[in-house]
Amino acid sequence: MPFDLLAERKRWNAGYESIDTSSQKLTEVVTPITVTWENIEVKTRKKLFSKKQKQLLNRVSGIAKPGEMVALMGASGAGKTTLMNVLMCRNMKGLEKNGTVKVNGTKIGKEISLISGFAQQQEIFIPTLTVDEYLMIQARLRMKANKHTRRERVDEIIEMLRLQNCRDLKIGTPGLVKGISGGEARRLTFACELLSNPSLLFADEPTSGLDSFMAASVVQILKNLANSGRTLIHQPTAELFFQFDKIIFLSMGKTAFMGTPHESVKFFADCGHPIPKLFNPPEWIQSKLSVIPNNETKSRETIGKIIEFYEKSIIHQKSIVEIRVIATTELPPYIENPGFFAETGALLKRACLDVIRSPAQMRMKLIQKVVMGLFIGSLYWQQPLDPRGVRNTNSALYFLIAELTFSTMFGIMTFMEHELPLIAREYHDGLFYVISYYISRFLSYLPLFTIDGALMIVISYWMIGLNSTWQQVAKSILISVLVEQSATSCGLFLACLFETTSLAIAFAVPASGLFALLSGLYGNTNNFPVYIRWMQWTSWCRYGFEGLVVNQWSQVDNPKWDPFYRELILKQFSFNKDNYQLDVIGLCSIVIFFYLAGYIALFIRIRLSR
């Protein structure tokens, strides 16, 4: 059964005395955590037509104590990332794991996410927000505390991580939108994780891509965090080797060494691989622990001897004893989630700021609808009440429905593809429920995808010469809003269902064409084959077109017309003069259906993304 972090958080806190950590200063010593792992084995799962399994980790053991900054090092493919994922219980899809991970002597699984933070290598933010705004919203999601306490925590973190100079700058997107620097983005990643004041912090290559000065600055920050009693486990680069308290070298899925940096230099000298003068120790060590492509046999033999030497060493024996004698102590409680309404409010604020600060999309949609309203109104200017005018008026009504459908559906599809990685990360960090995000994003787009359609109807309405009583105008606007929301909800569903926008569009093009065909303009739907005819009731184009046509002609009073002429106008499309209310109900049903389907698709997609 999928792991629900938010539900588990409530269960976790129920077992411990309530402790308010929201007001605790970050510089104060936190609840100490000792992490141990013993005999960790990880293999790929057997596939249906293959019995081969790849061994990623083989009986790996280790320990990380409070106040220690532990570095996982090794060549590419050594098992560093796999071990990190095992300790965090993340990204284990398709893998089989054996062995135990303990925190303070207690066996632990996915609940470790409740007492730890994870600063990932890839920085993903909302680029339109400032650093201060982003941290305040993150604090609202991570802390059950009042606004004053959250403000103090954010100010403290900004000062600690030296983000004062960029607190009011927009985050931006590297290479696209000017914003904060790479070093500031890396520190912002740590700032988000520190908001909940965790005792255990994981970091994935925190200095990768930074210059030597910025890398040293980040490591010094990590060192300060470790000095306050936190346990830090991360994958570093090799430049700052001697800054770490403990080094764990991995090779071929096994532990080749665990100890202090100075002990590693002595260890490799003792096993026959002394580090030459003027050589960088970590680079030399990693060269000896790497499998060289053109000399694999000799490389594996050398690595095997180093691992064997380590397993027989006193350093290894001491670590095994240390792992097994750790006393069981109380685990720290995790800060309680602020709740559904608080997190939805925070996400709604974030989404609205993002929409407001992306004026290009708003401007283009409004301009598009104004231009199309003027174009359709000019094309069908003041149609007379004769047979030709009736046909032209019906065509104008259909083109209004088509414009509300196609531009809206394809316009909404682009938002999910770029935002999903951030949402998946935050969800798996336990910051919110999927429904909270979905509601907030839907509400943030609602005004934009409502006003523009109504504006187009208002512009073109009197230009075409439609029935202009206030009741008819209001009914037409209602139909336009519901048609646009139908297209919005369908586009949102497809964006949530498919991994890329191109796939969603590839499906939407024939689907929208079918909906348009079933509208009634291109043929009397009652004359369609029975196996196709039923599909008209799934088409919002059909409901919308009928609603506008019925609204236009059911109340027209022209003394030159035959008494039955109005009914003939409707009958050619298989429309009924009493169906306006049914059309509104049908459109509302489609809107509700696609919004619910979109939520289910997004929920499944995010849950499976771990």
Swiss-Prot record:
The keyword Transport appears for this protein: yes
Any single Pfam family the record assigns to this protein: ABC2_membrane
Q: Could you mention a single GO BP entry for this protein? A: transmembrane transport
Source organism phylogeny: Eukaryota, Metazoa, Ecdysozoa, Nematoda, Chromadorea
Q: What is this protein called?
A: ABC transporter ATP-binding protein/permease wht-3
Domain of life of the source = Eukaryota
Its job = Required for efficient RNA interference (RNAi) of pop-1 indicating a role in the germline development.
Keywords, in A-Z order = ATP-binding, Membrane, Nucleotide-binding, Transmembrane, Transmembrane helix, Transport
* Gene that produces this protein: wht-3
Q: Specify the signal sequence span.
A: none
Where is the protein localized?
Membrane
Q: Which cysteines are joined by disulfide bonds?
A: none
Q: State the annotated membrane topology for this chain.
A: Multi-pass membrane protein
